[in-house]
Regions:
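Short hydrophobic alpha-helices and adjacent helix-cap/hinge residues
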Residues: 1-338
């Protein structure tokens, strides 16, 4: 059973904002939206199901854009940077009106293929300016806009949560993907710096485990056990998100506490998360796509940053791990899985 307390992000406010004026799509014209996705390609049945559950597509529908009626959605998938680069090139060749992605790494791949087709990113986990993807937050200036999540205060908070629930916590593993493969070394370096500073402040010894491809997660967890790590801080990238169930299962098998960026890791069995509401970020991303389809230029649309973060907790997982959740911590949870 899932209970929710104040499960409304600040980003929801105004998400049904009125469309832009008379400019943009001509009456009767079909909008073409491209989605670049991480993972194996879906079947037609899976695509049909996703169309009824996708927060982005639901957001588009609420704004008047319905797939199969006045909008065509081109989907392309990949499971590695090389595959995604090929998928991005294919989307660009199809001359879609706007491209939509969930992360900075995917936006970067698309930007290498096109400097003209607008790109909307719904949850860029890092500084888009420092990564060279936009000129400034107030005026991106190029063909990328959307929402970004700065981790400066979030990584320390996640480590604090681990410390609050794991007795005598002193050794933590930091599981991350090699984002340099996505040509975003600045973001990787920033993550490492923030985690190292937070660990020192909390008197925690941090051990970094970097996965490069599918199949390396099991080896990483074996390394954590060898190091006698007591908890795992999990970085979220599209690749890690696709493999979230494997990560959750490995953590359960090795009986180790975990803290994630998003509640979508906690629902299948992860212990805790602290971060933004990803479905709401996707719905907010739809607002950007709508504005662009109606004539706005991406370079003129300011980058948004969420101010509301949610703490999700899986009590069932805590019980299996033999952890007692302090009542004060439980009261602060926005989402509790019992």
């Amino acid at each position: 059973m899932i209970t929710r307390r104040a499960f409304i992000g600040a980003l929801v406010g105004g998400f049904l904002a009125a469309p832009l004026g008379a400019e943009g799509q001509k009456p009767g014209k079909i909008a073409r939206v491209g989605l670049l996705l991480v993972g194996p390609a879906l079947s037609r049945e899976e695509i049909a199901k996703a169309a009824t559950t996708s927060p982005f597509l639901l957001g588009m529908k609420e704004l008047g854009w319905v797939e199969g009626q006045n909008m065509v959605v081109e989907r392309r998938w990949g499971e590695s940077p090389d595959q995604l680069r090929a998928a991005a090139a294919d989307l660009v060749r199809r001359k879609v009106d706007v491209l939509f992605v969930s992360s900075a790494s995917l936006a970067k791949i698309l930007q290498l293929e096109t400097k003209t087709i607008p790109i909307v990113v719904s949850a860029a986990g890092g500084d888009l300016v420092a990564a060279g993807l936009v000129g400034s937050l107030a005026r991106p200036g190029g063909n990328i806009t959307g929402l970004q999540i700065l981790s400066d205060g979030l990584i320390p908070k996640r480590l604090e949560l681990l410390k609050a629930v794991v007795p005598n916590l002193s050794r933590v593993a930091f599981l991350q993907e090699d984002v340099t493969l996505w040509a975003l070394p600045q973001m990787s370096a920033r993550y490492d710096q923030l985690a190292a500073i937070a660990a020192r402040t909390l008197d925690i010894e941090l051990h970094t485990f970097i996965v490069h491809r599918a199949g390396e997660f099991a080896t990483a967890f074996l390394g954590m056990m060898k190091n006698r790590d007591q908890g795992v801080l999990v970085m979220s990238t599209p690749f890690i998100f696709v493999h979230r169930r494997e990560i959750v299962d490995l953590a359960a098998m090795h009986r180790i506490a975990t803290v994630y960026e998003y509640q979508l890791f906690v629902e299948p069995g992860g212990l805790m998360s602290y971060g933004v509401n990803i479905p709401e970020m996707s719905r907010r991303g739809a607002v950007y796509v709508d504005k662009i389809l109606r004539g706005a230029k991406p370079g003129d649309l300011p980058i948004e940053q969420p101010t509301k973060f949610e703490f999700a907790l899986n009590l069932k997982t805590a019980k299996v791990l033999g952890l007692t959740i302090p009542p004060s911590l439980l009261q602060r949870a926005d989402q509790v899985i019992e």
